[in-house]
Each structure stands twice: as structure tokens, then as C-alpha cells.
């Protein structure tokens, strides 16, 4: 099994030294991700493409899914590799492979070539196309919009048949740009803005301001883990949780109602700036869009930035909410975001849309900044790669079972892609498929006389969801543990 990885076009127009560095980093990222799932994978970089090989054909669907989510990959090709002797032999092998597929179809041949040969790419197209047209009576050549495009690549002494093309997410490889710290709330905006910086080549760390208790943090961890696991698992990243309940309490008590929203955002970016400074992170990222809510006017955003002490990036600044939700759906965070309440908006009934700097500074003089400093000092720092261990510590009241009882129903909370690829089939046992991002909204609709045993591949999401359900009063949940 072989894949040819084609690079994001912006990488190819870089200078030689920069392009080589980007390709080297992307090669390492691909290797880091695929090695976890297939120990036979070999990743080799070339001047303008990367070659991926595997000995395990059964892993093909999973490797395709992984490659589609790695930043820096524009598209990749599934190829069948064969030796060849000459141009006529290329035609013979193409005829053997494509004869049945071209019956009663229009077609064209597209060829690419690397190395020294006695023929050009155009000559391959003409010779092979003419031969196919002669030997398959019901096939017809059509150069524009044919039914079938026969794709051939000649790489020195190897003939490559293109079996399929898959699109990647593009962007730059993670690690080619500096680290950033994303202010993640679990909503639509912060999830999408985090993804956009991942795709642009930054290693994204996450800073969460907890305003809603354990259930809020569990929901945010689900989103963060999803973003990291799907798009950024080539790198170690940090999850920082800061309990902001005392800060909000101080604001409610000391700050004028109309100024609360701007002051709260200033406190958040102050705290995030301190965290960023501690880890030498160059910028913080927010999901704010111009005019979307009262605190997101240019006047207010400028005042918020003044408190940050570092660069503030807003990748969604010109996006409409409809666009943001569409992107959230595309990257798989929509349903998680739907279940996440918006805590920041509840503290101010009449927010100002044009805050005055002097008024904000005067209000902040009433604020006890020791409370903010204490919140930052007592922040929880977590390596996302160890989130499973931390989750296990937090769900000691959740039973893990490997033997099922008569009243137990397996609740498969994997994504639809995972269940399609590897369905869970247990003899004489009911299995309900309910993706993890729909559990919070749809679990209550299930038959509550049953006991539900949650299952996912690694046990991380199932533990998070079980804790979430327990927090919300559902005691008929356990976690499925595979027997060793």
C-alpha cells in the first residue's frame, strides 16, 4: 500500500531552505501520527512530495482518514506501483487494468513523469490513450469532462496507477509557526478559531476559564480533545483550566453593570497573557467576530487588547455566525458547541458598546487584583496526551465493566466514521450508536429503565461522557472496559 502526499501549494513557492524545512516538519508530523496506528508505516520525503508506505492493507481506510486531517497536506493519491520496461509495456498494463472499467465509457489519459526516459508525458497520454481507444470498441476518447480519467505516473523505473485522490485540509504543517494560546469556551467560535490556527501551522495550547463548574469543564475538555486528536496529535499541547468563579463574583459585586462585559474580557486576556508569558507563547487567540455581541465593537476590542500584554489574534473577525457554524460542522465541533451554554453573556444586562477607557480604568480600581492573581497561580495544567489519566482520576464513581448483565445496553459513542469503519458487533447484545457529541442532548430520550455501558476505542470519551451524565443526575451509566 502506497500513498503520494502532495503539499499545500504555498509551501512549494517558498525558498529552497524554507521549503525543505517545512517538508521535513510535515514528514515528522505524518510519522508521529501514523506510527501510533500502524507500526509498519514508512514515511519518505522527496523534493516536491512525500511517500507513505504500509505493509498492512487492512489499515488503508484508517490511514486515509488520518491523512485527511493533517495540516500541510493539500491532497494525496492512493497508488498501485508496478515495474515496466517501455512505453508499450505501460500501455499493456494500463489496458489490463482498465479494460472492464472503460466499457461504454468516455475517457482521457493524464500522465506525469519523473526521471530520464525516451518519451514525454504527452507521448504517454497519446500512446496509451490511442491504444485503449483501439482495443476497447465501446470506449471513446473525450478530453473534457470524460466519464473516466485514467491517471498514470512514471517515477524513474516505476509505473504508478492512481487508484483514488483524497483531499487534505491544506495549510501549513504544525510546528512551522510559533505556538499560540487559544481561549477556549467550548462554543462555536473558539473551537473554529482554534482549528484555523492549527491549520495555519501553529501548535495551539488551550486556556479555559471555568465559569460553570465541573460539567462546563468536562464539555470543554471533550472539544479540546477532539480538536487535538483529530488535527493536532503530532504535538504535545497543554490544557490550562483557570477557575474564574471568584473573579466573576468580584466583578458582579464591584463593577458597574454596563461595564462588566468589557472588564471580564480584560481580566481573561490579562490572565491568558500571564500564562502565555510563562510558556513563552507568542500570541493568544480568541473567537471574537466584529459586532457579533456588544463587547466585540472596535472600541471595546481595542480596550480589551490593551490589557493583554501580548498579541491577540482573531481569525474570525470578519466571519458571519452562519459561516462559523458551517465550519464547526465541517470540523466536527458543532454538536459539542450546541450543548455548551454561554456563560459570559449572563453577567451584564445593559452592556456598553462603546466603552470609555477612563471609565473602565476607574471601574477596575474597585477590583481586587489579588483574586485574579490567585486564580492564575492556582490554575490546573494538563498535558492533553494524559487526559485519559486525568479523566480516570475524576470518574472514580464511574464503574468500569467487562462482563455485561442482562439489563445492560452497549452505548457506542464513537463518531459515525469510526462505527462505519469498525462496527461493534456483540453476540446477543443490543448496541445503540449515539455519537459522543449527541450524548448530552439525546441520552435522556433513551429507555431509562436500562443500564447503559458506554464504549469508545480508547476509553477517554466514554469516561468524560459518563462523568457528564453523572453530573446531570443519570446514575444508570458505566464504562465498558475490554477484557485483557
Swiss-Prot record:
Per UniProt, residues of the Rhodanese domain are 404-483
In what residue span(s) does the THUMP domain sit? Answer: 61-166
UniProt entry tagged with the keyword ATP-binding: yes
Query: Which cysteines are cross-linked by disulfides?
Result: 344-456
Q: Which domain of life is it from?
A: Bacteria
Q: Which residues form the active site?
A: 456
SMART domains, per database record: THUMP
**Class of enzymatic activity (EC top level):** transferase
Entry binding sites for ATP: 183-184, 265, 287, 296
Q: Keywords assigned by UniProt?
A: ATP-binding, Cytoplasm, Disulfide bond, Nucleotide-binding, Redox-active center, RNA-binding, Thiamine biosynthesis, Transferase, tRNA-binding
Q: In which pathway does it act?
A: Cofactor biosynthesis; thiamine diphosphate biosynthesis
Q: What does this protein do?
A: Catalyzes the ATP-dependent transfer of a sulfur to tRNA to produce 4-thiouridine in position 8 of tRNAs, which functions as a near-UV photosensor. Also catalyzes the transfer of sulfur to the sulfur carrier protein ThiS, forming ThiS-thiocarboxylate. This is a step in the synthesis of thiazole, in the thiamine biosynthesis pathway. The sulfur is donated as persulfide by IscS.
Family that this chain belongs to: Belongs to the ThiI family.
NCBIfam families attached to this UniProt entry: ThiI_C_thiazole, tRNA uracil 4-sulfurtransferase ThiI
State what protein this is by name.
Answer: tRNA sulfurtransferase
Q: Which organism is it from?
A: Actinobacillus succinogenes (strain ATCC 55618 / DSM 22257 / CCUG 43843 / 130Z)
Amino acid at each position: 500500500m502506497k500513498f503520494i502526499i502532495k503539499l499545500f501549494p504555498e509551501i512549494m513557492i517558498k525558498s529552497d531552505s524554507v521549503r525543505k524545512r517545512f517538508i521535513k516538519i510535515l514528514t515528522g508530523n505524518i510519522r508521529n501520527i501514523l506510527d501510533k496506528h500502524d507500526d509498519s508505516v514508512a514515511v519518505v520525503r522527496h523534493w516536491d512530495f512525500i511517500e507513505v508506505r504500509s505493509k498492512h492493507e487492512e489499515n488503508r481506510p484508517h490511514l486515509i482518514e488520518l491523512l485527511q486531517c493533517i495540516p500541510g497536506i493539500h491532497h494525496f493519491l492512493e497508488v498501485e506501483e508496478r515495474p515496466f520496461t517501455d512505453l508499450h509495456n505501460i500501455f499493456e498494463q494500463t489496458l489490463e487494468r482498465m479494460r472492464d472499467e472503460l466499457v461504454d465509457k468516455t475517457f482521457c489519459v493524464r500522465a506525469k513523469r519523473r526521471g530520464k526516459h525516451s518519451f514525454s508525458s504527452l507521448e504517454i497520454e497519446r500512446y496509451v490513450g490511442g491504444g485503449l481507444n483501439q482495443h476497447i470498441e465501446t470506449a471513446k476518447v473525450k478530453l473534457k469532462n470524460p466519464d473516466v480519467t485514467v491517471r498514470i505516473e512514471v517515477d524513474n523505473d516505476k509505473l504508478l496507477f492512481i487508484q483514488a485522490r483524497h483531499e487534505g485540509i491544506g495549510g501549513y504543517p504544525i510546528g512551522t509557526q510559533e505556538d499560540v494560546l487559544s481561549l477556549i469556551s467550548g462554543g462555536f467560535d473558539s473551537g473554529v478559531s482554534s482549528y484555523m490556527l492549527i491549520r495555519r501551522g501553529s501548535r495551539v495550547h488551550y486556556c479555559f476559564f471555568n465559569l460553570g463548574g465541573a460539567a462546563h469543564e468536562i464539555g470543554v475538555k471533550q472539544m479540546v480533545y477532539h480538536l487535538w486528536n483529530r488535527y493536532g496529535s503530532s504535538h504535545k499541547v497543554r490544557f490550562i483550566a483557570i477557575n474564574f468563579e471568584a473573579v466573576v463574583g468580584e466583578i458582579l459585586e464591584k463593577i458597574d453593570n454596563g461595564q462588566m462585559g468589557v472588564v471580564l474580557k480584560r481580566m481573561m486576556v490579562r490572565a491568558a497573557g500571564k500564562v502565555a508569558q510563562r510558556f513563552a507563547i507568542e500570541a493568544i487567540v480568541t473567537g471574537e467576530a466584529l459586532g457579533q455581541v456588544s463587547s466585540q465593537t472596535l472600541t471595546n476590542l481595542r480596550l480589551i487588547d490593551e490589557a493583554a500584554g501580548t498579541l491577540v489574534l482573531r481569525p474570525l473577525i470578519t466571519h458571519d455566525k452562519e459561516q462559523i457554524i458551517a465550519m464547526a460542522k465541517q470540523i466536527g465541533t458543532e454538536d459539542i458547541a450546541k450543548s455548551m451554554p454561554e456563560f459570559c453573556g449572563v453577567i451584564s444586562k445593559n452592556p456598553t458598546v462603546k466603552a470609555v477607557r477612563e471609565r473602565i480604568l476607574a471601574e477596575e480600581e474597585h477590583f481586587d487584583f489579588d483574586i485574579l492573581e490567585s486564580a492564575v497561580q492556582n490554575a490546573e495544567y494538563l498535558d492533553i496526551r494524559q487526559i485519559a489519566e486525568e479523566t480516570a482520576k475524576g470518574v472514580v464513581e464511574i464503574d468500569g465493566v467487562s462482563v455485561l448483565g442482562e439489563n445492560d445496553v452497549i452505548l457506542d459513542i464513537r463518531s459515525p466514521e469510526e462505527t462505519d469503519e469498525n462496527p461493534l458487533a456483540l453476540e446477543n447484545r443490543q448496541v445503540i450508536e449515539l455519537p459522543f457529541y449527541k450524548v448530552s442532548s439525546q441520552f435522556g430520550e433513551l429507555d431509562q429503565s436500562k443500564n447503559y455501558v458506554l464504549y469508545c476505542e480508547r476509553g477517554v470519551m466514554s469516561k468524560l461522557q459518563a462523568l457528564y451524565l453523572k453530573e446531570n443526575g443519570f446514575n444508570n451509566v458505566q464504562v465498558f472496559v475490554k477484557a485483557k
